[in-house]
Amino acid sequence: MKKILAILMVLCLSVGILAGCGSSANAPASSGENSSASSDAASGTKKTFVFGDNTFNASNEEPTINPHEAYSGWPCIRYGVGETLMKIADDGTLEPWLAESATNVNETTWEIVIKDSVCFSNGRKCDAAAVKACLEHLIEVHERAADNLKIASIEADGQKLTIVTSQPNPVLMNYLSEAYGCIIDMDEGITDDGIVVGTGPFVATELVTDDHLNLVKNTNYWDGEVHIDEVTIRNITDGDTLALALQSGEIDAAYGMAYGSYPMFENDSFKFSGIQTSRCFWGMVNFSTENPSAAIMLDPAVRKAIALGINKQGFVDVLLNGYGYTATGAFPETFAFGQGVKAESYDPEQAKAVLQEAGWVDTDGDGIREKDGVKLVIRWLTYPTRLELPLLAESAQATLREIGMDVQINNTKDHNTIRKDPTAWDIWVSANVNAGLGDPANFFATYCLDNSVKNSGGHHSDRLEQLADQLDVTFDVNERARLAIEMQQELLDDNSYVFVSFLRMSMISKANVTGLEAHACDFYELTADLDIK
């Protein structure tokens, strides 16, 4: 009996003027920079929108909008250029998007029907053959996607796509909803500067990495009227500069605003759209024997003391101004697979006792413990494009100093290069959406396993590998949750990963901006609903 794992699309098309596939091409880019939208809206001319974002840059592995490169699928989907077959609802469930339905025929075969109305922004129909070409290129060039999807073959027949996987893959449709799953027109190709043609409400016309992206309205959009004519995405990595740009009217909305800047926008001139997310601030321990600090990081007492010595609640209350909540494991407790895990709580006195018992003693009175002539120094690697991460580093530096550790912070945009050098760091601390796909598998597959592309610390656990193998082929949702809880506990019992807090994500805009809504998966930002009133 066939298992329907995605909801059949039964709703009618949205009411509105829909441009059909094959209609006239989109307008070319206008010359010069876009001005703020509010002035254009007031004058009755074309509507423009300027969006400030501190994550759209090469150091964040988002140099372009090509979803087949690194993590560039994020700006592709966020800025309304690309769309995926299914969409992640705020409760973590799947909803149809480009696909009308997805049916799990058997453990390794899926049938996906593409909506007949979908077309690319160049007017070309998005049929199953176009999706096939896109996915085949994706798994050819994108290592992480190929490992996640486990696609053995793809067949196209009209609007029906048949995917056969090399092994049972219960969450294939979740993975195809990841940002790298944006469907792009491979006949159109990918430009040298990373511009692609998608199915979304906006069309990219100019991209300068680490600076800006220009977009225009997709006049062929298949899913409703697009209200904004032109969009400029500005990469603004400095928190103060981002705040001043919004306050002065240089931009119309901002993503990634520092929490310390929120009070200046808590008035009638601005509005917030916020939601609890699974974006987690967390640290990974370096287990490499090549690490000159191996004697420190391979000591279970040191790892336990670090977990005991980080004040999670203080970080949330003081440095995040309450815009977050403490973490125990990798996932929020709102998910079934985030419940019931146990981790060390902040207890500096117990941390001191653990270190003392393990032979880490301050013999020279400088406040830093040592053992066998080795000072207890922790090299903390993080990055500035998530404005909260440097604050977490400073908080941990202060509280770990109290228990006798010298935390040396390397806060650099080059962290993704440095983390690949096992001699250069002891703890790598980042911020990631751990349950953005509504399922736990992606976090473990990306960060925790022997073949994970971002297991930079070289963590290994026989038990974790066994559990991951079971998770990969388990279709029952409750059993998947049980396995994920056990996998988290394996990480926490060894203190090889420390999960500090989850983020309440907000976008801030001028009060006259509508249709800019925050979502729990953190994928969807600019949509056809975006408007200036």
Where are these regions (language model features)?
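N-terminal lobe/hinge region of extracytoplasmic solute-binding protein
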Residues: 52-105, 197, 521-522
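Gly/Pro-rich hinge or "lid" segments in bacterial periplasmic/extracellular proteins
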Residues: 71, 93, 176-226, 230, ...
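Aromatic- and charge-enriched surface segment that lines or borders ligand/interaction sites
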Residues: 100-142, 296
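Surface-exposed binding/hinge segments that line
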Residues: 103-107, 146-186
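Extracellular/periplasmic solute-recognition and catalytic clefts
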Residues: 145, 153-155, 205-214, 232-291
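Append "and occasionally in soluble cytosolic enzymes with long acidic Gly/Pro-rich linkers
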Residues: 297-397, 486
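Detector for C-terminal structural segments
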Residues: 309-339, 388-397, 419-533
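Ligand/substrate-recognition segments at binding pockets and active sites
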Residues: 361-434, 505
